[in-house]
Amino acid sequence: MAPKAADKKPASKAPATASKAPEKKDAGKKTAASGDKKKRSKSRKETYSSYIYKVLKQVHPDTGISNRAMSILNSFVNDIFERVASEASKLAAYNKKSTISSREIQTSVRLILPGELAKHAVSEGTKAVTKYSSSTK
């Protein structure tokens, strides 16, 4: 009778451990899979699509835009901003300043964009800065 009781105890422990082990493995797999999903959702791409869409609707309310066209415009905006920032950084370095001000941005826009486009960009930028300054006071 004693051997039967001893057999029962290890037998009852072994299946419990065995049943827990696969659950842990499955749980580990689930966490890894859900962890991957969480990582994917956390890595957001910042785009200008919503702003481009708003401007499009202001200019042409009945016109749509494809995803490919939106991607191209987003790349264009990123490229222009990168060029302006780079040029403004160079201008600040030439003048031995550590801060990029609106003056450096304005000058870099004049250097990068041609003719009338630069004039319009500068006037719109000045208008936006004025509007922002008046709203913060």
UniProtKB/Swiss-Prot annotation:
There is a cross-link at K8, K9, K24, K25 (Glycyl lysine isopeptide (Lys-Gly) (interchain with G-Cter in SUMO)). The modification Phosphoserine is found at S12. This is Histone H2B. Residues 1-10 have a biased composition (Basic and acidic residues). Core component of nucleosome. Nucleosomes wrap and compact DNA into chromatin, limiting DNA accessibility to the cellular machineries which require DNA as a template. Histones thereby play a central role in transcription regulation, DNA repair, DNA replication and chromosomal stability. DNA accessibility is regulated via a complex set of post-translational modifications of histones, also called histone code, and nucleosome remodeling. It is found in: Nucleus; Chromosome. Gene3D superfamilies: Histone, subunit A (1.10.20.10). It comes from Gibberella zeae (strain ATCC MYA-4620 / CBS 123657 / FGSC 9075 / NRRL 31084 / PH-1) (Wheat head blight fungus). There is a cross-link at K131 (Glycyl lysine isopeptide (Lys-Gly) (interchain with G-Cter in ubiquitin)).
